[in-house]
Amino acid sequence: TAVSTGSGLLAILVGAFSGVAVAAIFAVLTLTFLANQVATGLALTIFGVGLSALIGSSFVGISLEPLPQLSVEFLSTIPILGELLFGHDLLVYLSFIMILLAGYFLSKTRPGLILRAVGESHDSAHALGYSVLTVRYLAVLFGGFMSGLAGSYLSLVYTPLWAENMTAGRGWIALALVVFGTWRAGRIAFGAYLFGAITILQLHVQGWGINIASQFMTMLPYIATVVVLVLISQDRIKIKMNAPQSIGKAFRPAK
């Protein structure tokens, strides 16, 4: 879309709603037809890799115009903090806003509390008169929208060009972050920026004159993910208490 129209904003929206389309397929298969969620997720992941390679084959190597940075001149010149907090693109600042909105939505609003109730016990939520399937459909579609935004960021900002399998398994790190953050928005945000810092580290280490193999630096975010998951898995009681009790379970309404 960015190549054809020259509009980065339109490309972001197309990417986001492409994520919604794939999420809708997942929702229909798992919520309506009660397919196994893990197997369906893996199948759609493989399908997505192949489909994106097919569609993007004619765009390989074409450089894109990156999204403009939103900089405030007098703030961007502040030592250390200026470069760290100011002069980023729109999606970076949108991520800050979404973290706050997600935390507020889940803890302070009625729809957010209903969503949490469905996650904790779909049978109890159904008994109270809430439409479990509707809530789950909306949650899955929203997740697809955010995943699409993340994919758009990779190809329009992080590396403004298209390359096959450019995600390099980052989605699995995102999945691990949910466990790392014990299903709490603030903790997940901390983990996301922590792993993001580790990812960016590989781009700066060699510039600092540190002699470390680039292959090892590329592996580092995934190694860190495995190490963190092993460490937090030691506290199984805490994870079990925070994890929604109905997560991954098919909903079959009582007749």
For the regions a protein language model found, what residue spans apply to each?
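Transmembrane alpha-helical segments in multi-pass inner-membrane proteins
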Residues: 12-13, 158-222
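Transmembrane helix-bundle core of multi-pass membrane transporters
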Residues: 48-108, 209-217, 244-255
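Hydrophobic core segments of alpha-helical transmembrane domains in multi-pass membrane transport
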Residues: 49-53, 94-105, 143-150, 174-177, ...
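Juxtamembrane/transmembrane-helix interface segments of polytopic membrane transporters
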Residues: 2, 49-65, 147, 151-155, ...
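Alpha-helical transmembrane segments within multi-pass membrane transporters and channels
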Residues: 6-51, 194, 199
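Helix-loop interface residues and adjacent transmembrane-helix termini in multi-pass membrane transporters
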Residues: 5-6, 32-34, 108, 134, ...
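Cytosolic-side transmembrane-helix boundaries in multi-pass membrane proteins
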Residues: 102, 120-127, 131-134, 205-255
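Helix-loop-helix "hairpin" substructures at the membrane interface of multi-pass membrane proteins
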Residues: 84-162, 185-190
